[in-house]
Amino acid sequence: MAGRGRRRFRLVALDMDGTLYSSRGYVEELERAIVVLVAEMLGLSMEDAARRLMEAKTRALTTSASLGLLGIRRSEFYERLSQMVNPASHIKPRPGLEDRLRRIKACGVKIALHTNAGRPLARKVLSALDIKPSLFDFIVTSDDAEPKPSPQGYELLLLSAGCRAEQCIYVGDRALAELRTAKMMGMFTVKVGGRESIWADLHAGDIVEALELIEKLIKD
């Protein structure tokens, strides 16, 4: 851990879905709504929409990146999707999460949110978690940059924070869809949940544990 102290790290960037919370119920609701919406926007049957989406995700890795391959405007898609789902039915505030985020900010480190969701849906998820968007120094969504795994959003994070890649800690739950890009750019990566990965420098069971490890890392 030597040399990774306070003067090195200036930014902690956090993925949202699957990282700040874990909810199978919400994931299932979201996946159903996504297929319904793809079917509506492309004029397809549900079966064909699910097949087309699966084929696109095989190439693009994430739903957001797949939308471009399907010829769907992301901004319209996520605006409509945000009206179809209710995150608060499944996601509840996580005790200790906001406190841990504030402790990291108190170390003089910026906190950012990086999500492939559009801004309206991100606001609903944060509301379900009882976290105000203003807690983050800045938020990058698929409305602001090309979605993960494209490096564009990561570059915007660094530009907004005024720091280099090696001064950023990136936290996410998906190795190939998000941590790989961060790691290849030179960021320090933390994986939340699931199996350990070659693309993660640290692994944590959940977000609170991850933030505890990060605080120690920053103060080391």
List PLM regions with ranges.
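N-terminal helical cap/lid subdomain that shapes the substrate entry/recognition surface
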Residues: 4-99, 103-107, 118-123
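Asp-based, Mg2+/Mn2+-dependent phosphohydrolase catalytic module
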Residues: 1-12, 98, 102-105, 109-220
